[in-house]
A protein has these predicted regions:
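A short, conserved beta-strand element enriched in hydrophobic/aromatic residues
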Residues: 239, 327-328
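Helical hairpin unit composed of two closely spaced alpha helices linked by a short loop
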Residues: 330-351, 356, 361
Length: 472
């Protein structure tokens, strides 16, 4: 037993001095080492150490390709002057700000899939699809697979990538209609063992790029529940965007990076060099402006040096002067972001946050409510929707909006592969603002002294989950 404790101490010292990790997460792991001395180090080695991250980064060939193509696009594109609030982030993330885009806000699954199907039917060259959850055994999944198969038969190059962990029951055979039609289907970390080992590094992005000209991203996956068909979580509120313009090229580059990663994992099915050459031809800049909206595409995860989405949100929060509205299914962002929200509210900014009233994961919901308590005490207004909120949006001052795949939590900001679009446009921001205020009509505001009104055991439960929140 003494040997085990010495081993725990050595791991703890390494965690403290050599791992770039959130302080609260570090404290949680040290407590686990202390109270679970045998299994603690094993869990850490499997799920949180840099070893698995090192394995992923070594195999993630797409990162270097993404950097190269982004530099090429930056040189080709006559860069617009980015707003002062994000100039530092443009430089840090090395993804240029483009100002010739048209972005349409899609506020539910019905609208998103209706527009998506229309665009897919017009595809003539390529369709690239990436989802965390893609369930071809459900109605919307079957419809989409059938349409993709039809386009593949017409000679359109169709690539589909999904994450195994999103729907563990889904198998490759469920995509046979598309595969037999000539489409390519791949899985991110396909084996059950690899999915469990890499549970902390999930491909949480949602992205469709059509002919290199139109792109969709946001919170909506391909499953019936995203159309409000899950009676346990209805109504379902979600948000996606449809994009045309130069920003689509950067989204195409991101798909390319993720696709090349799975090609490296499945060399028996792919010639990676050929796949790269074909995908490079799909990275296109528009011949004419699609619109006048400014957009920056951000990605983060094990394949990026820094948490670019989190850092951008920090900057946007600090720049807000009048109002800041946030929608998120989970509110576990870490103390830095919580402090920034409190400071913004104390500075006179109208800070409001909309979270679900119906949880999908109860332990995460308890952590969300626990993080809400200190914000409520300091004046931040927080609402619970009568249904399930899966939208991941931020809007400030009728100037800037963000719509993406990243939840307002540590897992999205630091662990999973995520994607966000930051839109600088007054009309789009007003549309996001109005959508948020409309959602509040179906929501209940939490009281500032909410914590005093719940029972003793509920307070203990929420306190515990807030403590371990950085690990969720």
């Amino acid at each position: 037993m003494n040997v085990i404790y010495i081993f725990n101490i050595l791991i703890g010292l390494g965690l403290l001095f050599f791992q770039r990790k959130d302080v609260n997460a570090t404290i949680c792991w040290l407590l686990i080492f202390a109270f679970v001395p045998v299994l603690g180090p094993l869990f850490f080695a499997l799920f949180e150490s840099g070893f698995l991250l090192y394995l992923l980064s070594k195999q993630y060939r797409g990162s270097s390709v993404r950097q190269e193509l982004t530099q090429e696009l930056t040189q080709k594109y006559q860069k617009a002057v980015a707003p002062l609030s994000i100039r530092g982030m443009v430089q840090q993330a090395k993804v240029p700000y483009t100002a010739d885009n048209q972005v349409d806000l899609l506020i539910d699954g019905e609208e998103k899939f209706s527009r998506l199907f229309e665009d897919l039917k017009t595809a003539t060259k390529s369709i690239n699809v990436l989802y965390f959850i893609f369930d071809p055994t459900e109605e919307i999944g079957r419809k989409l697979i059938n349409l993709l198969a039809e386009k593949a038969k017409q000679g359109v190059k169709v690539r589909l990538l999904y994450d195994r962990f999103g729907r563990m029951r889904v198998r490759r055979k469920d995509f046979l209609a598309l595969i037999k039609a000539g489409g390519q289907v791949e899985v991110f970390l396909p084996s059950v063992l690899r999915s469990l080992l890499f549970v902390n590094y999930r491909l949480h992005r949602k992205l469709v790029v059509i002919d290199g000209k139109v792109a969709y991203t946001g919170g909506i996956n391909v499953a019936d529940e995203y159309l409000g068909k899950n009676p346990k979580r209805t109504p379902w509120r979600d948000t996606s965007v449809r994009i045309r313009g130069s920003a689509v090229a950067h989204l195409q580059v991101q798909f390319m990076a993720d696709w090349l990663f799975v090609c490296e994992q499945n060399k028996h099915r792919h010639d990676t060099a050929q796949e790269e050459a074909e995908l490079r031809k799909q990275v296109l800049l528009p011949d004419e402006d699609a619109g006048s909206m400014g957009v920056q595409v951000l990605s983060c995860g094990p394949d990026t040096e820094l948490p670019y989405i989190r850092d951008t949100y920090l900057k946007l929060i600090s720049e807000a002067k009048e109002y800041l509205f946030i929608q998120t299914p989970y509110l576990i962002p870490g103390d830095t972001l919580l402090d920034m929200l409190r400071i913004a509210d104390n500075s006179g900014v109208d800070v409001r946050i909309l979270i679900p009233g119906i949880p999908d994961k109860k332990f995460v919901y308890y952590a969300t409510l626990a993080n809400a308590n200190p914000l409520l005490r300091n004046g931040v207004r927080i609402y619970t929707h009568k249904g399930f909120v899966h939208a991941k949006t931020l809007v400030a001052d009728d100037k800037v909006s963000a719509v993406g795949t990243a939840n307002f939590d540590n897992r999205s900001f630091r662990i999973n592969y995520e994607l966000a679009t930051v839109v600088h446009d007054e009309e789009f921001a007003k549309a996001c603002r109005d959508t948020f205020l409309k959602d509040l009509e179906d929501a209940t505001e939490l009281l500032p002294d909410r914590e005093k009104g719940i029972g003793f055991f509920s307070r203990i439960r929420e306190g515990f989950w807030r403590l371990v929140g950085p690990l969720l």
